[in-house]
Regions:
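Amphipathic alpha-helical packing segments from all-alpha helical-bundle domains
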Residues: 90, 124-150
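Amphipathic alpha-helical segments used for helix-helix packing
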Residues: 107-132, 177-178
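Alpha-helical DNA-contacting segments of helix-turn-helix folds
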Residues: 58-64, 68-71, 134
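All-alpha amphipathic helical-bundle segments outside canonical DNA-binding/catalytic cores
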Residues: 130-133, 150-167
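Hydrophobic alpha-helical connector segments
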Residues: 73-112, 159-166
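Short, leucine-enriched amphipathic alpha-helices that occur as contiguous helical runs
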Residues: 7, 11-15, 19
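Helix-turn-helix
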Residues: 13, 21-55, 59-63
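N-terminal intrinsically disordered/low-complexity leader segments
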Residues: 1-9, 72, 76-80
């Protein structure tokens, strides 16, 4: 029974509108009333589907942000399959293209980046969830790819800083388009 109500169109509309409003105004900047009005739902629907505003916020990240991040990562991996053996320049180029010209439409990219920027500026429990489930595994995968291509004797900390620097530059240009 609970599963049927979770799939209702009101829940999807709430997730859609909450994502847009959270991206534009942040968690604290939007009220439950504003979200339900935008979604055309009853005020009690946030409680009914999510329990509270905080849970709705987490669900926006879980069911909207995380799948988009996985699409970007998959786009990166697919690009890498076109060239064997891998080179440092191909990894960096593929990473940049996945974030700058990747699989997201303009509206998805804008929401995705605004949500992340707001979460970084005012962290909540969502940031730890994203770090554990998306960011750390992806960053580990990236450094594992880079390790055999960098000079022998390079310290692990230097590799991590280099990878973070590359990633930061790509994100800087990607976020600059918001």
């Amino acid at each position: 029974m609970a599963e049927n109500r979770m799939r209702g169109p009101s829940k999807e509309r709430l997730l859609d509108e909450a994502e847009i409003l959270f991206a534009e105004k942040g968690f604290e900047g939007v009220s439950v009333r504003e979200m339900t009005r935008a979604a055309g739902c009853n005020l009690a629907s946030v409680n009914y589907y999510f329990g509270n505003k905080e849970n709705l916020y987490m669900e926006v990240f879980r069911y909207r942000w995380m799948p988009r991040a996985k699409r970007i990562h998959n786009n990166f991996r697919q690009s890498l399959q076109t060239q064997k053996p891998l080179s440092l320049s191909h990894i960096i180029q593929s990473l940049g293209m996945a974030f700058l010209r990747g699989p997201l439409c303009e509206e998805e990219r804008r929401c995705h980046q605004q949500l992340m920027a707001r979460e970084l500026a005012q962290p909540t429990a969502a940031l730890e969830m994203l770090a554990q489930e998306i960011m750390r595994p992806f960053f580990q995968e990236l450094t594992d790819m880079l390790r055999p291509l960098v000079p022998e004797g390079l310290e692990e900390s230097e590799l991590m800083l280099g990878a973070m620097g590359i990633f930061a530059m790509i994100l800087y240009f990607s976020f600059g388009r918001v």
